[in-house]
Amino acid sequence: DMPNGGRGPAEWQMHKYYDGADAIRSAASEANYRKEWKEIIDYLYSYPSIGVWVPFNEAWGQFKTPEITKWTKEYDPSRLVNPASGGNHYTCGDILDLHNYPGPNLYLYDPIRATVLGEYGGIGMALKGHLWLADKNWGYVKFNTPEEVTNEYIKYADHLLELIEKGFSAAVYTQITDVEEEVNGLVTYDRKVIKVDEPKIKAINQKICNSLNK
């Protein structure tokens, strides 16, 4: 997910990423957002797999962040609230969520809330015969073999281990599967080919998961 709508990493890098400038919505737009956000929570309230509500992603349509976060926490006090995943950051809610590509980076920290890396990675490998589009694919970095993808993943994971010691509480890799023209999945778009060395990926992931069990 890029703030420019997916038109390319160059524009993503130039985007004003966390300057705190929320959108100014019309009264009708705000009312529609509030209505639909409440409907989403009402519909998904009983799903035990949902542990965090995220009102905004990467500043898309983000507005009145502290107010929306406060309402969400009061409406469902049983769950954590991540005010904006990779968006304009405010000192509200339970989580400070950073996005960084391709490798992990801890460029902001909050000692009160959980500091998480909500997105990183994007290691691309286009595998012919398993693509959504045959000739238009991208990743933040691109490789040609499973060995190269695995080695790059492990390199990022090793760096992540260092950042966990400095303050990260969680991290989310982009992404599990290819998504349309995004070929940065660990598995192809058709779910037929795993593009990495499974035992090596499992080993480094377990090392990360157990890194705080000391």
Task: Give short role names for the model-derived ranges.
Residues 1-95, 100, 104-112, 131-135, ...:
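Active-site mouth of glycoside hydrolases
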Residues 34, 49-53, 70, 108-214:
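Substrate-binding clefts and catalytic carboxylate motifs of secreted carbohydrate-active enzymes
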